[in-house]
Amino acid sequence: MEKSVNHNEVLEKVVEFDQNIYDIQDIDILLEHILSEIRKIVKADAGSIYVVEDKNLVIKYAQNDTQLRELQPGEKLPYKSFSFPINEKSIAGYVAYTGKPLVIDDAYNIPEELPYKFNKQTDLTTNYRTKSIYTIPLKMPDGKIVGVLQIINALDENGKIRSFSIQDGIYINHFATNCEQALKQT
């Protein structure tokens, strides 16, 4: 019974969010808000939104609760604006290239035969450990890919990293639609 109560509470939050989302006019604030909300709903530690610019993916929005807690007052997260090509080599690039979502249980154990790889350098640079990843393309109604939503490290009730569930995927897909609608306005 507790799961259905939790599910109902989450649905109420989603509906409330959807009712208030269009009051936000600033695209940057809106996308940051969407990213923050989906991370809360699926209990994910981190996430990013990438936007397509000149055949590359550019990270525009990044959030990471673990790293945020470790910052000294006045410090900012160590993310720099960076871009990489849309191709099959990276996880986000693969999703933008193929238009298909990817759900990865352990970023460090991706089978060798797959074309995409996890870039461990980001974890090394930021002293973080990425494990579970849910990456979904952001598409316009005509099918054009305009970005990628990536949610990282789903957490269980004890704060341990877990795989993303089917239910998480439903919520992430819903919020990806919100991102698409926001990007459509730009």
Ranges and model annotations:
Residues D105-S132, L155-R162:
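Signal-transducing coupling segments at domain and membrane junctions
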Residues K131-M140:
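A short, aliphatic-rich beta-strand micro-motif
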Residues K139-I145, A154, T186:
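Flexible loop/coil segments at beta-strand boundaries within sensory signal-transduction domains
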Residues D18-Y22, I34-K43, I49-V51, K76, ...:
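Short regulatory alpha-helical segment in sensory/regulatory domains of signaling proteins that mediates
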Residues S36, S48-N87, N109-I110, Y116, ...:
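GAF sensory/regulatory domain recognition
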Residues K144, G159-K184:
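Amphipathic alpha-helical "output/dimerization" segments
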Residues G93-L102, Y108-E112:
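Soluble sensory domains of the PAS superfamily and closely related sensory modules
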Residues M1-H33, K40-I41, I59-Y61, A182-Q185:
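Signal-transmission linkers at sensory-effector interfaces
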